[in-house]
Regions:
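Glycine-rich Rossmann-fold phosphate-binding loop(s) that bind the pyrophosphate
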Residues: 44-45
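N-terminal Rossmann-fold NAD(P) dinucleotide-binding loop
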Residues: 48-49, 115
């Protein structure tokens, strides 16, 4: 069986990766404050490029290996890594990176359906791991990833970068402080204008000689059902296909849901979920919906998510924006995004942070935001610090599993077409139409095909 053999845009099929295989290469101790952290980058596409560049900016981090299945991507990022470290190596097989005893931390920026295999193998090899969001493509994968991190006592930071943003941290403290009163509804939304052609309709290609320049397509597909080559199923657009990802909900939605749940209490889990939507506007070949509304019911609040890929205008009473989180409370409302946050009081008041109370106001001014670039830098700083200290990162793997799983069950409810009862402790659906419950539970624990096994 093929186990922990992830590819992405980067890596190849290898034998089972178990902890006992790596006893001879495990790091002997937590890295000291002055030691260089040596990184291996697996998957160096769009997100992988950004993560590589951010690592290269730090004087205490050295890229020593890059890995990708796409020949052009690999060559470009190898040259980039060599601009800082001439001895950096290039690989198609990601296990060569993980088995390299000189690699301290693995940066996993693969397509979503390879996150689990890469992360589990890296944890079992004793490496620190930075894994892009979403953590997984199924709830079952997330469970296995959390288990691998725990059994190896591994530092794992996930790519939910908003946790490192000052405006998000401040806004969360405001919500937790009670100044909004009782929050009964948290709305999240992610919008963009791509109508109607979107990602386009490139043809499937069945002749390997014609698609071979992109790399080993069969290896890239790995454990999922194999399909004819289509350029949209690789490269930048993989996330719009349910084979490899979860659409906008697991792409942008996981960022928003993560912050919403952090503010409302991470120990609180939804008890039911429903979703509606479809592919109504777009004429491209995506398989994920272009319009989606999801509703999760918690014991004492409702969380909702809206996605439309055919309009960038948010139809709410606050500043128009293309993404955000809105906390609706009995004493006020807080709107939060990467652009900043704004408190909108009831009864024409504003919040005085020094007095920690509402007061009359003439106009409400927004708190300015920390830019995206700073979010990534602060997030990496936290990861590096935790590698040295052994402390739990701000986007620790348990938190990202929770937020990713909540998104997965939203997609499951959409595909099953029913409102479903969720048991957060068991992480399975326990109520709803029998056929829908069965379909949804199968979706969140999809089996590995083509000879692959998980963990």
């Amino acid at each position: 069986a093929k186990t922990a053999a992830g590819i992405t845009a980067g890596a190849a099929v290898v034998k089972t990766a178990r902890a006992d295989v790596y006893k001879s290469i495990l790091p002997s101790s937590v890295l000291g404050a002055n030691e260089m952290i040596r990184t291996g980058h697996i998957g160096v596409g769009v997100m992988g490029r950004g993560n590589l560049l951010n690592n290269m900016k730090r004087p205490d981090v050295m890229p020593i290996a890059v890995c990708d299945l796409h020949p052009r991507m690999l060559a470009e990022k190898h040259a980039m890594a060599q601009s800082k470290n001439p001895d950096a190596t290039a690989h198609e097989d990601y296990m060569e990176v993980i088995e390299n005893k000189d690699v301290d931390a693995v940066i996993c920026s693969t397509t979503d359906h390879w996150h689990a295999m890469v992360t589990i193998a890296a944890c079992d090899a004793g490496k620190a791991v930075y894994c892009e969001k979403p953590l997984s493509t199924t709830v079952k994968e997330g469970q296995a990833m959390v288990a691998a991190a725990k059994r190896n006592n591994t530092v794992v930071q996930c790519g939910t970068i908003q946790r490192s943003g000052q405006q998000f941290q401040e806004a969360i403290e405001l919500v937790k402080s009670g100044v909004l009163g009782q929050v009964g509804h948290v709305h999240t939304f992610a919008l963009n204008m791509l109508a109607p052609s979107g990602i386009g309709n490139p043809p499937d290609i069945t002749d390997p000689e014609k698609w071979g320049k992109f790399g080993p397509w069969e290896k890239y597909q790995g454990w999922v059902e194999h399909k004819p080559f289509n350029v949209n199923r690789w490269l930048n657009h993989f996330r719009w296909f349910f084979d490899y990802a979860g659409g906008k909900l697991t792409d942008w939605g996981v960022h928003l849901v993560d912050i919403a749940m952090w503010a409302m209490g991470e120990d609180k889990l939804p008890k039911s979920v429903s979703a509606s939507g479809g592919k109504f506007i777009m004429t491209d070949n995506r398989t994920t919906p272009d319009t989606l509304n999801v509703s999760w019911e918690f014991d004492n609040y409702l969380m909702t998510y809206t996605n439309r890929v055919w309009t960038s205008y948010a139809d709410h009473a606050m500043d128009p924006d293309d993404h955000g989180i809105i906390f609706y409370g009995t004493k006020g409302t807080l709107k939060l995004s990467r652009k900043g946050y704004k408190l909108i009081p009831t009864d024409n008041q504003e919040f005085d942070p020094e007095a920690k109370q509402w007061k009359k106001f003439e106009s409400a001014e927004a708190k300015e935001a920390m830019g995206d670039g700073m979010l990534y830098e602060k997030h990496l700083e936290n990861f590096v610090s935790c590698i040295r200290s052994g402390e739990k990162p701000i986007s620790h793997i348990e938190s990202c599993h929770r937020s990713s799983a909540v998104c997965h069950i939203g997609n499951a409810a959409y595909l099953a077409g029913a409102k479903l009862t969720w048991d957060g402790a068991k992480e399975q659906f326990v109520g709803g139409p029998d056929d829908a419950v069965k379909q949804a539970n199968e979706w969140i624990a999809r089996p590995y095909l083509n000879g692959y096994t998980l963990g």
